[in-house]
Design a protein with these regions (language model features):
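Residue-level signature of outer-membrane beta-barrel architecture
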Residues: 124, 154-156, 189, 231-233, ...
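Transmembrane beta-barrel strands of outer-membrane/channel proteins
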Residues: 106, 133-137, 148-150, 164-170, ...
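Transmembrane beta-strand segments of outer-membrane beta-barrel domains in Gram-negative
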Residues: 195-357, 414-415
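Outer-membrane beta-barrel domain signature
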Residues: 11, 79, 137-143, 172-176, ...
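C-terminal transmembrane beta-barrel domains of outer membrane proteins
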Residues: 314-425
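Transmembrane beta-barrel architecture of outer-membrane proteins
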Residues: 20, 88, 147, 180-182, ...
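Outer-envelope beta-barrel architecture signal
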Residues: 100, 116, 127-131, 146-148, ...
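Periplasmic polypeptide-binding modules associated with outer-membrane biogenesis and secretion
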Residues: 2-139, 168-182, 328, 348
Length: 425
């Protein structure tokens, strides 16, 4: 207000100060804040009426998406309108899953210029098919070091917000002989605004092609079924936290040549073992301008009723009671992008078994868990911890292709307590 301070006439000075303050507020983004002059007291005064967002409306063809976006924007209702902050929030909306495009407008509510209506028009275009194919050399020990992975993801397949994921993997040696194959399908379906359910089925076959002893014809077949429900406890434009609970059922068969053979701890004379467990916990995820993070705390509880009486007896001989198998775990990860070509990734995981666990409940170490430079799975145990950090630099980029240099450092340890003693590695 310095330019108007030297004006001698009180009325002219008041009007000039009001105009200067209005211009400054508008330049700072307070576009519907108004400055009024008052003649009482005689010296006059300036009255500033803050412009606010009085109402938020979201329009579009997808009712579920409209409700979600309105809930995310509802905290704006009643707040002071500042255009740069509002534009930043709208830009974050465009990054949300299911949003193909957004148009935002501000309208006056009635005749009051300080009360604005925010109108968001959403285009919920159907998500396109996404795929990924990669060739790597971090296969599984015994099943070949060369690894091929293929993934297909289709969102909005049956209804808005759902997702179908197809995954395939093969491992071979240099001959090439097929050592491992895996195929899985999973589907996620939203039920309402907060609840979603997921189901998955996977089948795999592992042949120990790299082992000559005790017998090169040892192989395993595994079937896995998973069902899980996620419930969103809270969500903002930058973060989401939710609870989850699921049931996993696993069946593994051991073979010597083409004949079933009891190769598994707990398997009977027919060579197969079925176990299952519940997994439940809390999780959170979020992102900012340069960072993203996620974390979860979970519990595991074995289910005895999924194994046969003979299998329970054999497992009990080794001190494993599926109905008493319990564990607690924690997973954390974070990504920081300090510059356009640089990215720092940190991740850690830990699990503590409260009682001896069945095999599928354990924690594994390998590149599948973030430990680069190792096979997909090297070793597993009931309890364990791991940590890994990597700093990636994009040395060359062209379109969708790029070459990265990724120095990394990682370590882990697992252990299993049985009646015979502790196994660790």
């Amino acid at each position: 207000l310095a330019p108007c301070a030297d004006i001698q006439d009180p009325a002219a000075r008041l009007q000039a100060c009001a105009a200067a303050l209005s211009s400054r507020l508008y330049a700072d983004g307070y576009t519907n804040t108004r400055v009024y002059t008052r003649q009482d007291p005689p010296a006059g005064l300036l009255e500033v009426v803050e412009g606010r967002i009085a109402e938020v409306r979201v329009e579009g063809p997808d009712g579920r998406l409209n409700r979600r976006l309105r809930n995310l924007l509802l905290p704006l209702q009643g707040t002071v309108l500042r255009l740069p902050e509002l534009e930043a929030r709208v830009a974050r909306l465009e990054r949300l899953s299911g949003v193909a495009g957004i148009q935002a407008s501000l309208n006056r509510l009635g005749s009051d210029p300080t009360r604005a209506v925010l109108v968001i028009t959403v285009d919920s275009g159907r998500r396109t098919l996404q795929g990924d194919l990669s060739l790597r050399n971090d296969g599984s020990t015994g099943s070949g070091q060369f690894r091929g992975l293929a993934t297909l993801l289709q969102g909005d397949l049956v209804r808005s917000g759902d997702a179908l994921l197809l995954y395939g993997e093969v491992n071979t040696d240099s001959q090439p002989n097929l050592g491992y194959s895996l195929a899985s399908i999973s589907y996620t379906l939203p039920l309402g605004d907060r609840l979603q359910i997921s189901g998955a089925f996977g089948a795999s076959r592992r042949n120990l092609i790299e082992f000559d002893r005790p017998d090169p014809d040892l192989s395993f077949r595994q079937l896995q079924v998973l069902g899980q429900a996620d419930y969103t406890l809270g969500e903002t434009l930058n973060s989401r936290w939710f609870g989850f609970a699921g049931l996993s059922v696993n069946r593994t068969d051991g073979y010597l040549g083409a004949r079933a053979f009891p190769l598994l701890l707990g398997a009977g004379s027919d060579g197969w073992l079925r176990t299952g467990f519940l997994r439940f916990g809390l999780a959170a995820e979020g992102q900012g301008e340069r960072i993203s993070w996620s974390g979860s705390a979970y519990g595991l509880q074995g289910v005895a009723g999924l194994s046969t009486a003979e299998q329970l007896k054999i497992l009990g001989f080794y001190g494993i009671e599926p109905g008493r198998s319990k564990a607690l775990g924690l997973q954390l990860s974070g990504v920081w992008r300090p510059a356009r070509r640089w990215q720092l990734t940190l991740q850690a995981a830990a699990q503590q078994a409260l009682n001896p666990l069945t095999g599928a409940m354990g924690i594994s170490l390998g590149s599948d868990n973030g430990l680069r430079g190792l096979p997909g799975q090297v070793i597993s145990g009931d309890s364990g911890l791991l940590g890994e950090t990597e700093l990636s630099w994009s040395a060359w980029q062209h379109g969708q292709a790029e070459i990265q240099l990724v120095p990394f450092l990682g370590a882990g340890r697992v252990s299993t307590n049985l009646q015979e003693g502790t196994i660790s590695g």
